[in-house]
Amino acid sequence: MPKMKTDRGVAKRFKKTANGFKRKQAHLRHILTKKSTKRKRHLRNKCLVAKVDVPAIARQLPYA
């Protein structure tokens, strides 16, 4: 049986940790002038993928 392929787009966006998969928050790429400093500061923090999405991410990262 051939090796399973890792989804490269998913590999670049998510990192496996002991508690699940770490991800970056959205809404911090452009149109930042109208967003408050507080909002942008909170968006800089990493967060975990929702529990319901973990199986799909894990399937795309077979060696994570």
UniProtKB/Swiss-Prot annotation:
The keyword Ribosomal protein appears for this protein: yes
Organism: Shewanella oneidensis (strain ATCC 700550 / JCM 31522 / CIP 106686 / LMG 19005 / NCIMB 14063 / MR-1)
Domain of life per record: Bacteria
PANTHER family noted in UniProt: 54S RIBOSOMAL PROTEIN BL35M, LARGE RIBOSOMAL SUBUNIT PROTEIN BL35M
Family designation: Belongs to the bacterial ribosomal protein bL35 family.
Pfam family, one: Ribosomal_L35p
An annotated Gene Ontology molecular function: structural constituent of ribosome
Disulfide bridge positions per record: none
Residue spans crossing the bilayer: none
Keyword terms: Ribonucleoprotein, Ribosomal protein
Keyword Ribonucleoprotein attributed: yes
Entry GO CC: cytosolic large ribosomal subunit
One record GO biological process: translation
Identification of the protein by name: Large ribosomal subunit protein bL35
